[in-house]
Amino acid sequence: MALQGWRFFGVSATIIIYIGGVLFLSMNNIPGSHPKRPRIERFAEFPSFHSPRFPMPSRKMTIRWCRDLKYMNRDLPNYTDYRADFYTLPSDVSASLQASPMLTALASFPGSGNTWLRYLLQQATGILTGSIYKDYGLLKTGFPAENVCNSSVLLVKTHEWGGKSWAPFAKAILLVRDPEKAIIAEFNRQSGGHIGFASPDRYKRTKGKYWQQFVSNKLKGWELMNLSWARNFTGSIKVVFYDDLVHHTERELRAILEFLQFPVDETLLRCAILRKEGIFRRKKRLLSFDPYTEAMRAQVQARKRIVYSLLGRKEH
């Protein structure tokens, strides 16, 4: 009997100790029952680190305009009035384009500096430029007249060619760039946006076949785009070469404004020249390899010589 009593006592004590331990642990895990340990953050100064050389990804790009932008006939509403959901893309772009004796196209192959020229003209005139497209990136960073295709804007951006493409326009500025550079610029845009870059790995996808096909397709498009507008557009046309715009910016802007029959404001023009780099001209980046093979470069240069000759451009 005494042995059984001790066994009963031992089992009871074990159960009591177990229950007590469970209760103790439960009380310690109740939220707020004990102070929270401070979180030690390594390199805690980094979240507040900002440098103009290394902008944070979420940092909003801002443009200093020489003058508040407006439409040709009315002041521009506040930028905050523009919301992406206010815009609807027409099912037929040509239906939104109305032929006008005042409508001027800014035609170019993608990667030829169209956005940069629009930026320069907005700086030099204070007038908005439009587009047949609705690029939300541009819409939010200095081009609120994206998808405006009427004479309320200075000119209208297009990368299209063919009868329907030029029918609404009375005049056109054709911006032409060296195809070798334009194709790389377009490759960068498709991979990294208007001011970004394609990673080196992108050129080597599928053992380089993707890049080779890209060059072949875009070279044909470059030739068709430029010759189609230069030969078949029946309105007044002015050909502007990107290299001239880079090296003789003021001279070219004056000539463009004269073609547009828009009076030159000397103060605005000086301001535009001072701020000509802006944020829409992609900075140069040297690759550690040449993306063009000898055969590709020979093909590109051959087509360039033909097109430039037909456009009246003499290459030295």
From Swiss-Prot:
It is found in: Membrane. It is a single-pass membrane protein. Glycans are attached at N78, N150, N226, N232. InterPro entries: P-loop_NTPase, Sialate-O-sulfotransferase. GO terms for cellular component: membrane. The keyword Transmembrane applies. Keywords: Glycoprotein, Membrane, Transmembrane, Transmembrane helix. The chain crosses the membrane at residues 8-28. The keyword Protein biosynthesis does not apply. Belongs to the WSCD family. This is WSCD family member GA21586. It comes from Drosophila pseudoobscura pseudoobscura (Fruit fly). The lineage of its organism: Eukaryota, Metazoa, Ecdysozoa, Arthropoda, Hexapoda.
